[in-house]
């Protein structure tokens, strides 16, 4: 494995929430794979913790990762055995996390859980869902068109944009690219190169790494909280 310390994940999340509340950042952005194998009870527990962050005056923005929706491996483990448990659909995800980006969105995509949110008067978030059941690890054609319209609107409004995706915009490693880089990332890279996008934030690869597209845009990949440093 990649060194995930699952036995301590609850303690890690509690410490993370406490640190976020203490440091009071302008926002908390979570780019997906939020739960333990997509289990509903894991989603519900996290939403309660994120509510504490929101109640401290810190806006929270979430996206689903590839392990968060319609999970066939959602389970509860006890001793040497396990029991299958419920996962969540895309609609249920949006309902559970409605207060963390969806309710206040400037625009929501009709074909995915993508949305645009305002961080300030001149800075927006493009939260791009690349984990639909119709196109896993890819941007849907309709979603790409929607994103193009949102970026054009941001430019017209004099706003810069931070893009966010779960999977990566570029290959961060020669060993880890297939299944990690968005399958049609080239279309996104071309779009972002002519848009007011400052950078892309991603995860998925469980590596802490920064890399640039051919146009000079940074893709900043953040490792998993449950992976040992």
Language-model features, listed with the residues they occupy:
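N-terminal active-site segment of His-dependent metallophosphoesterases
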Residues: 1-40
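Extracytoplasmic/secreted envelope proteins and their assembly/folding machinery
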Residues: 13-17, 43-47, 93-94, 144, ...
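His/acidic metal-ligating clusters that form di-metal
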Residues: 24, 59, 124-126, 134-218
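Divalent metal-coordination and catalytic microenvironments
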Residues: 28, 33, 46, 65, ...
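Catalytic metal-binding/acid-base residues of hydrolase active sites
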Residues: 34-35, 66-69, 131, 168, ...
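Short, electropositive alpha-helical surface patch
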Residues: 42, 46-54, 178-189, 215-226
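Extended active-site neighborhood of metal-dependent phosphoesterases/phosphodiesterases
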Residues: 45-145
């Amino acid at each position: 494995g990649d060194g995930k310390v699952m036995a301590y994940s609850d303690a890690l999340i509690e410490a993370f929430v406490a640190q976020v509340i203490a440091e009071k950042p302008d926002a908390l952005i979570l780019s997906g794979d939020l739960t333990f194998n997509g289990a509903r009870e894991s989603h519900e527990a996290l939403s309660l913790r994120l509510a504490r962050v929101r109640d401290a005056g810190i806006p929270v923005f979430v996206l689903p990762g590839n392990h968060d929706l319609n999970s066939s491996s959602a389970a509860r483990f006890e001793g040497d055995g396990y029991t299958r448990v419920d996962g969540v659909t895309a609609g249920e995800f949006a309902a559970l996390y409605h207060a963390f980006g969806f309710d206040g969105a400037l625009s929501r995509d009709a074909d995915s859980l993508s949305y645009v949110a305002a961080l300030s008067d001149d800075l927006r978030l493009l939260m791009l869902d690349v984990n639909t059941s119709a196109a896993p690890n890819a941007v849907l054609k309709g979603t790409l068109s929607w994103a193009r319209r949102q970026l054009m609107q941001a430019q017209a409004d004099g706003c810069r944009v931070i893009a966010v995706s779960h999977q990566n915009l570029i290959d961060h490693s020669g060993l880890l690219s297939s299944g990690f880089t968005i399958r049609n990332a080239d279309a996104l890279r071309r779009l972002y190169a002519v848009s007011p996008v400052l950078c892309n934030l991603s995860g998925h690869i469980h590596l802490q790494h920064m890399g640039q597209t051919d146009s000079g845009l940074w893709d900043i990949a953040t490792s998993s909280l449950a992976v040992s440093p």
